[in-house]
Regions:
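Bacterial Sec-dependent N-terminal signal peptides
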Residues: 1-23
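Subset of outer-membrane beta-barrel
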Residues: 20-412
Length: 412
């Protein structure tokens, strides 16, 4: 159970949940930490066990039922007629929290050899929250939750290339309608779209190469106040993912694949603000607490499209910091006789951008009509701050995949 004092403005409440402060001062600059934060970060959580076991790798791996999150264009090359999967991710268990969970349901249907449609439902439960006032009196109790519902269409444009388009509705209710002083709160809502592409070709009789790109969550800013304020609203996690994967068939029974993903948020980087101190003749600090002159970087309060473009060149430390904003995933998958899989991977995020570093491993077993997958996350950040205190440490994912076409054919 968690307690939150509901006595400040909603912006502060938003920061309690997600750390969504978009300004830094000299103290932050000295520490070097300049993370990019957004609303509804649950959209960035890897929902399935296969990709979760490969270091969050997925934009160019072979198509599967969970391709929606990683690259909807891959559905055009999927072999089975129809499929569905359900995944469950217990979240932040390393913090001793037992009631935060992600549930994920996805499915697809091949209209013909060229076209495929797909859908997904993502539900994030943040557990029980008790709201208190300045006197610690309980003023309410609520279970914050978020969800996203999406549909996608994928089509082959050639024997080697496909594109995908997806639309998504996002709903985030963190406060249950509680008010912060005179500021009323509402559930945040947004509409977003994904645009993706996938290319695959044979390098030899036993080796293939695939390349993928996905720009996801292109949509309106999200606000939790009754009166929408463009400057006070938060970006949703508009994201660019690019990667490749090489598949090698060793013989009739053994197959391996290895790939790399690069990932970058397409939202503004927080600038550095001047922390100006003014002392009067009596030695009293009369500084203006609202002084917000930008001394490095760019104004993050811009429109969505401007923010996407600006995200490539707005970092306070220039190109060096822009490159630090790229996360890397690398993963390896081994299949034996298309029935048993072993997977491992590594994820890297620069320390100044969050410092997530972890190894992953997992396994999968496929039967005639269903497949069971599991993944496990191991903390790899051994810095003094992160070692032994990574909230993602020991995260497990569970996925159950159904080949509905085989079920119909076999009469199950």
């Amino acid at each position: 159970m968690k307690k939150i004092s509901f006595i400040l403005s909603f912006v502060f409440i938003s920061n309690v949940f997600y750390g969504q402060s978009q300004s830094l001062n000299y103290d932050d600059l000295l520490g070097g930490l300049n993370t990019i934060t957004t609303a509804v970060p649950f959209l960035q959580i890897a929902p399935d066990s296969r990709a979760g076991a490969m270091g969050d790798l997925g934009v160019a791996t072979s198509p599967d039922v969970n391709s929606f999150h990683w690259n909807p264009a891959k559905y055009a090359f999927i072999e089975d007629k129809v499929g569905a999967a359900v995944s469950y991710v217990p979240w932040l268990r390393a913090l001793g929290i037992s009631d935060i969970n992600l549930g994920y349901l996805t499915g697809y249907y091949k209209l013909n050899d060229q076209e495929t449609v797909a859908a997904e439902l993502r539900y994030f439960n943040l557990g029980e929250i008790i709201f208190t006032n300045s006197n610690a009196d309980v003023i309410g109790q609520y279970n914050p939750h978020e969800l996203a519902i999406a549909a996608a269409y994928a089509r082959k444009l050639s024997d080697h290339f496909s594109m995908g388009l997806a639309g998504r509705y996002i709903y985030s209710n963190l406060t249950g309608g509680q008010s912060a002083g005179a500021v009323g709160t509402v559930a945040g809502q947004s509409i977003a779209a994904d645009l993706s592409a996938y290319y695959i070709t044979d390098l030899s009789r036993t080796t293939d190469l695939s390349v993928g790109i996905n720009i996801s969550n292109m949509g309106d800013k999200l606000s939790y106040t009754k009166i929408f304020d463009e400057r006070g609203a938060d970006f949703i996690p508009i994201n660019l993912r690019l990667g490749y994967c090489v598949g090698i068939r060793l013989d009739d029974y053994n197959r391996i694949s290895i790939g790399v993903d690069m990932n970058k948020l397409l939202v503004p980087t927080p600038p550095i603000y001047d922390k100006r101190v003014t002392i009067d003749s009596a030695g009293v600090d009369i500084s203006n607490p609202d002084y917000n002159q930008i001394i490095a970087g760019m104004d993050p309060n811009v429109a969505v499209v401007s923010g996407m473009i600006q995200s490539f060149y707005d970092a306070p430390d220039g190109l060096k910091e822009e490159l630090r904003e790229i996360n890397y995933s690398t993963g390896l998958e081994y299949w034996y006789n298309e029935q048993f899989a072993l997977r491992t991977g590594y994820f890297f995020e620069h320390n100044t951008k969050g410092g997530r570093k972890f190894y992953t491993l997992g396994a999968g077993m496929k039967y005639t009509v269903f497949e069971i997958d599991f993944s496990y996350l191991i903390n790899a950040n051994r810095t003094e701050i992160a070692a032994g205190n990574n909230p993602l440490a020991n995260t497990m994912r569970f996925t159950l995949v159904f080949d509905l076409g085989a079920i119909q054919e076999d009469g199950f």
